């Protein structure tokens, strides 16, 4: 994203550079015709951004100015690479006397060069391309358009900027300019073979254009070549001039290459060309070149014949002209019907990788770019599908602003693609992500860690292919394994001398991806399957610790394990294979450390494997180097698997140590195991205060354990509301980074503590305090507090001053609850029910009796909407929850306006009081407006029409009221008759008679 700042291109061009964002801001004045054209070079690697032209009254464009970056890059930097660029064109400034923004914009991106365009008129631009993602039309100038630079090539080198270099010579002020010689563009122009010129002598000579050709140049160029002339006329003199012509048709540069060159008869006369035009002389884009020949005769008289013939060619070399983005594509933005004198603003940002010149390098730190083949390959794949993904080169500015979040989501390889899913692009992007990483892992073996870290939709197996490509094969040589319905992915490998051909197969509903890996190394056996489908399994958490010695745990974590029927060592990580324990019936449980006998009687063998996640009918295997487990934490899950033999994974984790007597013993580290279950969206079942309290014996467990747990709500650990926002992520990273280890000594120590607690009440109390600290997650806090209070003085003072049971402070804090039982706030469910009841009571006070608490809960915990209220008022039927009834909200209700209301409105509109009454025709017009508006008065547009109608009727009505005479300034004001007092009335003539 250009507006988010510069970033290094993640390719393998590793040169130390600095990143810089350069702004471009121009206020362009609109010409007399109100039309103009802005030419952008969105991919040009340098300071040039574009050029502005105004349309003249004769229909031709006139050059106004070049558009550049704010800083002149060649003055401080030697080499450059363009990373990204975006430019916005809009108008928000009005000249005096103009009160509204007028005008529209057409914009198009043309994949060729500027000189190749044949129609650059406002409407003709839209025919330059048929790609709808490269053109937009009739955008209001107030909204504006945004031009986006999309890469046309990758893995590009740095471009020399044409920086000045001091020259050594007689004049120390002379400088040399080092231009880019990388990828020049060469135009070869050939004159017609044996071109024949014939004319009569004229004073001042006869001028002809020998040739004219289209070229494109905005940087330095050179012209080289030669022409050969032959003549049979004595005294002929030739002059040759080369013109470089701009886009507007005016001459930008003129160079005389021959002046008064005499021709010798009967021989070849050579005229060589060798011109160099520096960048600073090219003041506007060049689009054509012309060679003119002036023919004259020494001592010629009127009527003398002048004859010659010519042949030859020349070449125009544009330095760096074929560098991708330098001259093509171009984006043209044309505006039309904008008020004269208005200001069109061009603003944007260009992001560069720059290598400073030696002077600046003394004070500027440079760094190498980041080589990320995955990101580079992903970018190529995304932009190759840009038409399908809706990525355009020109945008309405408001639409581009709205799409920025979509671009940011697509750029993040780990994003869940929510916005892309809303636009229907999710499947395309996910397919691209699946393709991008195998190519990275195959072609770039050192990037194997990247393949493991890509995230959603990428299989960990691809990283193993990268290891195989680098010489450590991860597939068994010559052992073909067929894909089955249970296995989502597997590796099939065959040894062919020094090559290993590996194919990644998937089940029929997924595509097949093939990859060829070359390896001279020795093959080692490994399967590395990551997911098992439709496999019955039971789950149980195991506490895993990192220890400093046999009795000092350093950190506690927990891992979820699955019990699968049969011998399935191929699903285990290499660290667990070959290790098993026998049960009382002689069967084996693989994945356990060979420590004694498991106190269970089973009817078959089982395998215990670590897992990372569980889905509806599949489990995701873990590749962490987990050692064989010890202890009896998995006895309950193994027993359940042996009795019920489920066909799908049971979505409830089990905990508890089942002994030979059928009793379920409580386990320690309750909060750690709960966190592990919740992280996978599972509930924890076992004896005690777990999510499901199954009781202390096997019979109670069978009755209370849910046999259809797949219908339970999943509460992902990462989204639990009572945790800090980043707690789930930190827990996940901690588990991924921990060094797992569990020892038999730790299990023995736990059992020894439980035995001591049964004998010593004081130790039982101490153990209860420890479990209380562990369950509430404050073990570390208490340990830190103990270090700061070695003699327990602060703790004694705290306990001595603690409120006693029944005290005033105790009742104020805990209410009527017992000591130590702190009053709690309502649960989310209770708070939601209280809110529903509160809304229902409020509706009841307003006379809306159908909004019961149950109805409010079904309506999304909100009161009735306007549509629901209208429906209930009109039909007196209870509206359905979550139905908006929009027809009742927006339906127009007809009502008739009274004649008095219409007459009053007509009189008010037709004229002021005291003037003539409105004619019946005008009253009828007002009545029509009221009828159209269903009884409402006229709106603004209708009021304008009625005022115009009244004005016309007044002018053609001979009986219209005469205008009132203006009062004379010297006329005495007449005192209006009125009351002389409260009890005195005026005497009239009748009273006198």
UniProtKB/Swiss-Prot annotation:
It holds the Pfam family Birna_VP3. The active site is at 633 (nucleophile), 673. It comes from the Viruses. GO terms for molecular function: metal ion binding; serine-type peptidase activity; structural molecule activity. Residues 950-993 are annotated as: Disordered. GO terms for biological process: proteolysis. Residues 956-967 have a biased composition (Basic residues). Residues 984-993 are annotated as: Interaction with VP1 protein. Residues 494-736 form the Peptidase S50 domain. Keywords: Capsid protein, Host cytoplasm, Hydrolase, Metal-binding, Protease, Serine protease, Virion. A divalent metal cation binds at residue 11. The record marks 422-423, 468-469, 475-476, 482-483, 493-494, 736-737 as: Cleavage. The keyword Metal-binding applies. It is an enzyme of class 3 (hydrolase). GO terms for cellular component: host cell cytoplasm; viral capsid. Its EC number is 3.4.21.-. Capsid protein VP2 self assembles to form an icosahedral capsid with a T=13 symmetry, about 70 nm in diameter, and consisting of 260 VP2 trimers. The capsid encapsulates the genomic dsRNA. VP2 is also involved in attachment and entry into the host cell by interacting with host ITGA4/ITGB1. The precursor of VP2 plays an important role in capsid assembly. First, pre-VP2 and VP2 oligomers assemble to form a procapsid. Then, the pre-VP2 intermediates may be processed into VP2 proteins by proteolytic cleavage mediated by VP4 to obtain the mature virion. The final capsid is composed of pentamers and hexamers but VP2 has a natural tendency to assemble into all-pentameric structures. Therefore pre-VP2 may be required to allow formation of the hexameric structures. This is Structural polyprotein.
